[in-house]
Design a protein with these regions (language model features):
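Intrinsically disordered, low-complexity regulatory segments in ankyrin-centric signaling systems
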Residues: 4-5, 27-50, 59-62, 70, ...
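Hydrophobic h-region of N-terminal signal peptides that target proteins for export
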Residues: 19-27
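Ankyrin-repeat boundary/"N-cap" motif
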Residues: 29-31, 57-64, 90-97, 122-132, ...
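Conserved ankyrin/ankyrin-like repeat signature
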Residues: 42, 75-76, 107-108, 142-143, ...
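Ankyrin repeat domain, specifically the short helix-to-loop turn at the C-terminus of the second helix
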Residues: 47-52, 78-86, 110-119, 145-153, ...
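Leucine-rich solenoid repeat scaffolds
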Residues: 153-181
């Protein structure tokens, strides 16, 4: 039996590795592009081929679910939820709830509230406070109402130790006051 050993030049080996790395990078980047602006069908097809990318973080530390939510791509975000996306990851910019409050994405926030997500998330507390504090600071009235309806803890104190009533006084906003009383 004759064994044939094929050898490759260093340039061919480098080219092969570059192709493998670039190919992985392209597929990896694709999930983030689809999260931002792809369709549900496109994401479904992608996840069938690359299910391990469901909770992969981008080079900026963001998940496909967070990107879809932030960009208002709610159909894709819902698909990612159905597939088991991690909804409790603490990002440098805060939690998923903080992103939804910031973008005023009531549709997804209501879905998460109904599914029992932790409304008293302390992710990035020093920077953003509890979600209820963040919503109050941004004057997201509908979000505040949704959080109250979802039984958010109203006894939590902000980063400076102020309770909800003190914050209501500080904000001096009749709409916020009305939501709590």
């Amino acid at each position: 039996m004759k064994v044939v050993v094929k050898t490759y030049s260093k340039d061919k080996v480098k080219l092969l590795f570059a192709f493998l790395i670039f190919g992985f990078s392209v597929h990896s980047q694709r999930i983030f592009d689809l999260a931002r602006s792809g369709t549900v069908d496109q994401m479904q097809v992608h996840l069938q081929s690359y299910p391990e990318q469901l909770n992969q973080l981008s080079e900026n530390g963001l998940s496909p679910f967070l990107l879809a939510s932030y960009h208002g791509n709610n159909g894709v975000a819902k698909l990612l939820m159905e597939k088991g996306a991690n909804l409790s990851h603490c990002y440098d910019e805060g939690s998923v709830i903080h992103a939804l409050i910031y973008k005023n994405n009531l549709e997804l926030l209501e879905l998460l509230v109904n599914q029992g997500i932790n409304l008293n998330d302390t992710c990035q507390f020093a920077q953003l406070g509890y979600p209820i504090h963040f919503a109050m600071a941004l004057k997201r009235y509908e979000v505040i109402a949704l959080l109250i309806k979802g039984n958010v803890d109203l006894n939590v104190k902000d980063q400076q130790g102020r309770d909800i009533n003190q914050l209501i006084s500080i904000y001096n906003d009749p709409k916020i006051d009305e939501l709590f009383h």
